[in-house]
């Protein structure tokens, strides 16, 4: 007799399985991970699941055929651990009053699960990970350490004092750099306005890594900015798709 908690055990085991190749999308205004049905079948046929199934068949039902895989997946749907969904395209997003996003595609709940190979499903099961527990412990320890600051030894207080001064110094340097950078840009417009002005660290406020923010050392206009280059690459990909 199978364990009534079997769907939960299966979902927990395969929640972050590499075979799912899951992505993040926006489902009911929340970031949720979704995958294709055929990917879940592959995860059920993986060595990891097979080994678990052989040791604990009550928790992890054996999968010997495609029909077995469908039965296991249906049990997850009935337990509402996964839900069928549709990935909306740009035009469909606008029809539903949603802003299209390439990074996080919008997902719409489907009324029926057909179990087609390319049908999308979204996870509603989000078990706590070790990282989540460590984060909670870290926050609690941090709060207790802050509350107990008066009891700290003098040497530790001195270290915190110098660290605070260092952080304030970095903030002051960054603010001064931003101010000097802007002043130089405004002055440069009188000499090279046709090139978009002269920038020191053109990527300083771009959405990129810390090291990339300071590369290149200087540039003209926005043509060397990370955001502009990324936008041009997207435009190029769109043109190539249209040609195809």
Swiss-Prot record:
Give the transmembrane region(s): 133-153, 159-179
**Matching Pfam families:** Sec62
Major location category of this protein: endoplasmic reticulum
A Gene Ontology annotation in the biological process aspect, one of them, is: post-translational protein targeting to membrane, translocation
Lumenal face residues: 154-158
Q: Where in the cell is it found?
A: Endoplasmic reticulum membrane
Question: Could you tell me the superkingdom of the organism this chain comes from?
Answer: Eukaryota
Which Gene Ontology terms of cellular component type are present? endoplasmic reticulum; membrane; Sec62/Sec63 complex; translocon complex
- What UniProt keywords apply to this chain's record, in alphabetical order? Endoplasmic reticulum, Membrane, Protein transport, Translocation, Transmembrane, Transmembrane helix, Transport
Pull the Cytoplasmic topological domain ranges from the record.
1-132, 180-244
Q: According to Swiss-Prot or TrEMBL, what is its membrane topology?
A: Multi-pass membrane protein
Supply one GO molecular-function term: protein transmembrane transporter activity
What this chain does, per the entry, is described as: Required for preprotein translocation.
**Family according to the record:** Belongs to the SEC62 family.
Task: Please give the subunit comment from the record.
Answer: Part of a complex that contains SEC61, SEC62, SEC63, SEC66 and SEC72.
Protein name from the UniProt record = Translocation protein SEC62
Q: Which organism is it from?
A: Eremothecium gossypii (strain ATCC 10895 / CBS 109.51 / FGSC 9923 / NRRL Y-1056) (Yeast)
